[in-house]
UniProtKB/Swiss-Prot annotation:
GO MF annotation, one: DNA binding
Function in brief: PPIases accelerate the folding of proteins. It catalyzes the cis-trans isomerization of proline imidic peptide bonds in oligopeptides.
Domain PpiC: 39-131
Protein name according to UniProt: Peptidyl-prolyl cis-trans isomerase PIN4
Gene label: PIN4
Domain of life: Eukaryota
Region (Disordered): 1-42
Family under the similarity heading: Belongs to the PpiC/parvulin rotamase family. PIN4 subfamily.
Length: 133
């Protein structure tokens, strides 16, 4: 029984490990190939602030549970009237730094946003993604 258990564990381990290794390798080696499976375009919102202090105020509001689109209307220096909505964006259409973090971000809603910060030549961004396709 010990041999059978070991063989079963090895087979299971190889299959699981092989799959994990393959997926990790695909993601690392092919870069955009791994990400392309997830999404070619994203429905993205952002809050753009030129000043670090203003970005920190916006983050505090988000962390206090205020809806993303409401914070965008109050703090964003871009697309404020649309609640920060940039709409559907394809790969290659955004600032490279912005795009890298935006395409890696989980989708969420404005009521309960999952967001990330990034600094680009435009200023400080707080980004959330509403959908991907």
């Amino acid at each position: 029984m010990g041999k059978n258990d070991k063989k079963g564990a090895d087979k299971g381990g190889k299959a699981k490990g092989g799959d994990k290794g393959k997926d990790a390798k695909d993601t690392k080696d092919s870069g955009s190939g791994g990400k392309a499976k997830g999404a070619q375009s994203i429905n993205v919102r952002h809050i753009l602030c030129e000043k670090h202090a203003k970005k920190e105020e916006a983050l505090a509001k988000l962390n206090d549970g205020v809806k993303f689109d409401e914070v965008a209307r109050e703090y964003s220096e871009d697309k404020a009237r649309q609640g920060g909505s940039l709409g559907w964006k394809t790969k290659g259409s955004l600032d490279p730094k912005f795009e890298e973090v935006a395409f890696a971000l989980e989708t969420s809603t404005t009521n309960s946003p999952k967001f990330v910060e990034v600094k680009t030549g435009f200023g400080y961004h707080i980004i959330m993604v509403e959908g991907r396709k």
